[in-house]
C-alpha cells in the first residue's frame, strides 16, 4: 500500500478523480467526514489530507510515500524529493501583477512586493537586477497594492479574473505550474514495484 499526501481542496478532488479513473481508488472519501486519513477499500492507497504547503514536508520526512503538490509550492520550498511526473492537472501560473501604470522599468527605488512566495519572488527580482522588499502574506494578496502596502504582487493566476476585478494587470509570468507527483527517495526504492506501477498508470492521461 502507498500512503499519499494530498492537498485539501480542488487539487485533491482532481487527483482523486484521476486515481479512480485509473483504478487505484474505488471511491471518493466522504466530503462531510472530518477524518484526515482515508483508507480505500481496494487497499492500494491510503490518503492523508493536509494543507497544500505541508504535502512536501509529509513526503520528505517519510510520513507519506508520495504526494501530489503544485510545482509552485515545490519550487518555493526547495525540497529534496523525486518529482518524476507532471500530472497536467491544477494548471496555473505564478505571475507578477500590479496596478495600471506600474512598470519595472520606471521604478527607481526598492520595489515593495506582496506575496505568498518570497523565495521565488526574490529570485525573480534578483535576476532582473532589481532591489525589492518582500512582504509575506497568507491570503488576499491582491489587496496589498490597493491600500499602499506594496507596489506589486507575485501570486498564482488561473484566469486573471480576480486581478481584473481588483484593478490589477499581469506584467510577467514567473513560473508555469501544475500538479506534480512526488516521492521521497526511500519509498521510491523501497516500494519500487508499487511506485512504478502507480507512476506508469497516472502517466497515461
Curated annotation (Swiss-Prot):
Pathway: Amino-acid biosynthesis; L-histidine biosynthesis; L-histidine from 5-phospho-alpha-D-ribose 1-diphosphate: step 1/9. Its EC number is 2.4.2.17. GO terms for cellular component: cytoplasm. It catalyses: 1-(5-phospho-beta-D-ribosyl)-ATP + diphosphate = 5-phospho-alpha-D-ribose 1-diphosphate + ATP. Pfam families: HisG (PF01634). It is found in: Cytoplasm. InterPro entries: ATP_PRibTrfase_cat (IPR013820), ATP_PRibTrfase_CS (IPR018198), ATP_PRibTrfase_HisG (IPR001348), ATP_PRibTrfase_HisG_short (IPR024893). It is an enzyme of class 2 (transferase). Transmembrane segments: none annotated. Keywords: Amino-acid biosynthesis, ATP-binding, Cytoplasm, Glycosyltransferase, Histidine biosynthesis, Nucleotide-binding, Transferase. GO terms for molecular function: ATP binding; ATP phosphoribosyltransferase activity. One of its GO terms (biological process) is L-histidine biosynthetic process. Heteromultimer composed of HisG and HisZ subunits. Lacks the C-terminal regulatory region which is replaced by HisZ. NCBIfam families: hisG. Catalyzes the condensation of ATP and 5-phosphoribose 1-diphosphate to form N'-(5'-phosphoribosyl)-ATP (PR-ATP). Has a crucial role in the pathway because the rate of histidine biosynthesis seems to be controlled primarily by regulation of HisG enzymatic activity. Belongs to the ATP phosphoribosyltransferase family. Short subfamily. This is ATP phosphoribosyltransferase.
